[in-house]
Swiss-Prot record:
A biological process from GO: nucleotide metabolic process
Phylogenetic placement of the source organism: Bacteria, Bacillati, Mycoplasmatota, Mycoplasmoidales, Mycoplasmoidaceae
Domain HIT as annotated: residue spans: 10-117
Organism encoding this protein: Mycoplasma genitalium (strain ATCC 33530 / DSM 19775 / NCTC 10195 / G37)
GO molecular function: catalytic activity
Full protein name: Uncharacterized HIT-like protein MG132
InterPro entries named among the record's database cross-references: HINT, Histidine_triad_CS, Histidine_triad_HIT, HIT-like, HIT-like_sf
Motif (Histidine triad motif): 102-106
Entry-linked Pfam families: HIT (PF01230)
Amino acid sequence: MEKNTTSSCIFCDIVQGSITSYKIGENEHAIAFLDAFPVADGHTLVIPKKHAVDFSSTDQKELQAVSLLAKQIALKLKMTLKPSGLNYVSNEGAIAGQVVFHFHLHIVPKYETGKGFGYNVNKTNKRSLEENYQLISESKN
């Protein structure tokens, strides 16, 4: 496991075991634990063990590990807590709501009570689908 690239990453501290967490799953490159500030029962975070600031900067190996572990956790949550559905959420950048700058995937169970994750759509002047398609498809990435 590569060393934390920031001096004060709480998720790196959890990976290293210097901060206690409610770990509910793990594989070679990822770990899953209950969110300390849950928005619903069973709200879980799945993170790569190797520090990466966000989704876009996370290596493929770690992304695959996070994805596979997220699926295992989702099945555990469905079997044990019986939610009506699940939200999978990752915020990238402060403006998008990212608070901890170590890539993490939220798995938020949804129950009939309506509690849990939700979002509001902001109405803006949007480019047409055709304009967005042209911009994105011409990118070399």
